[in-house]
Amino acid sequence: MEDEPAVRWNHNIHYHRHILDVVPDGARTALDVGTGDGLLAMELREFVPQVTGIDPDAQVLKSARRQQSDVTWLEGDVMTYPLTPASFDVVASVATIHHLPDLEATLTRLAELTAPGGTIAVIGLARSSRLLDHAYDIGGFIQHQRLARRFGVWEHSAPTAPPPHSYTDVRRSAARVLPGATWRRLPLWRYALVWTKPTR
């Protein structure tokens, strides 16, 4: 059995800090959607007392359960699992939304699960469709080479899929479903989406 690297790094882990930085003060509950190996959920647990990770893949959840017992691990589809609406102060997702078939229905579901005053924080993948997107891709390639040489690339066990939506599609859908959301293109082929649910 191979030893785990001293520092786990890949494109998704690189942006966990973007999620942790927007956890609301006093947050008590968090949901990690598409938790996979559970790395983000375990980091959230350092800031939030009650963390739930949900994923439809039983195999990747086995790895998560082995590493952390102080998180509630659920096997299921976030779109249909009977989670209590408006019950999470943080709803986070990294590299998951593009796996789900209906982007706007997914964003609506995440908003439904978010408590008033709570935050949705997404790091997602999308397709490049504009010149500016391709410029980010070039910058991301250079950054990847530098960071991969420094840390190596940790391969997660969760399945992967190409993103069906463009960055423009995601930005427009977020504006429709989550008014006031902030959207930002990131290097390393990712975007960040953050939204705070109104309190009334």
Residue ranges and their predicted role:
Residues 92:
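A conserved beta-strand element that flanks and buttresses the S-adenosyl-L-methionine
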Residues 105-116:
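A short glycine-rich, Lys/Arg-flanked "PGG" loop and its adjoining helix->strand segment in the class I
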Residues 37-80:
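Class I SAM-dependent methyltransferase SAM/SAH-binding core
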Residues 95-96:
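Short catalytic micro-motifs in class I SAM-dependent methyltransferases
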Residues 125-173, 183:
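C-terminal alpha-helical "lid/dimerization" subdomain adjacent to the S-adenosyl-L-methionine
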Residues 10-28:
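Conserved alpha-helix/loop element of class I SAM-dependent methyltransferases that forms part
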Residues 28-36:
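Conserved class I S-adenosyl-L-methionine
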Residues 117-124:
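Conserved beta-strand signature within the Rossmann-like core of class I S-adenosyl-L-methionine
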